[in-house]
């Protein structure tokens, strides 16, 4: 199967998976995601892609990158850039990649947990912005 057809969509999906990884994953989360990313070397729909992915994850293993969302997201970005370099395609900085995904999703993507930065004053300000304070608070929290 031609990776020029399925590859960009597949990378988009892998990045999206990393952006929804827990901020503070437990051991079970870490094991599930590790299994997911490692099993890909056997499932990619292109023999050469499978070989190259296997080589890349041996060179740059996922171990040590499962302690946080940011760490996993950066690992996926770095693996993606390694593949792009091998294929003579342009690479992007981590910041450029994140901005690209934020534009595509139309919202901020948090790699660090934003909740410690939510103050009581911010919550009060949000609640006063509408007659239905609870709805405003709920909507603001799900879009953080």
What label would you give each PLM region?
Residues 11-18, 37-40, 53:
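Short alpha-helical scaffolding segments that buttress acidic/His motifs in well-ordered protein cores
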Residues 142-144:
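Conserved small/polar residues in nucleotide/adenosyl-binding loops
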Residues 121-129, 135-139:
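Long, His/Glu/Asp-enriched segments that create or flank divalent metal/ion-associated functional microenvironments
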Residues 46-49:
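Short, thiol/selenol-centered motifs that function as redox-active sites or metal-ligating centers
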Residues 20-41:
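Glycine-rich loop/turn
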């Amino acid at each position: 199967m031609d990776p020029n057809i399925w590859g960009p969509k597949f990378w988009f999906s892998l990045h999206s998976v990393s952006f929804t990884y827990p901020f503070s994953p437990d051991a079970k989360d870490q094991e599930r995601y590790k299994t997911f990313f490692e099993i890909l070397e056997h499932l990619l729909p292109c023999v050469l892609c499978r070989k190259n992915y296997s080589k890349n994850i041996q060179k740059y293993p996922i171990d040590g990158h499962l302690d946080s969302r940011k760490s996993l997201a950066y690992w996926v970005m770095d693996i993606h850039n390694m593949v792009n370099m091998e294929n003579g395609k342009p690479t992007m900085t981590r910041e450029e990649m994140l901005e690209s995904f934020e534009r595509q999703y139309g919202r901020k993507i948090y790699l660090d947990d934003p909740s410690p930065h939510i103050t009581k004053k911010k919550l009060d300000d949000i609640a006063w912005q509408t007659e239905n304070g609870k709805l405003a608070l709920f909507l603001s929290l799900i879009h953080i």
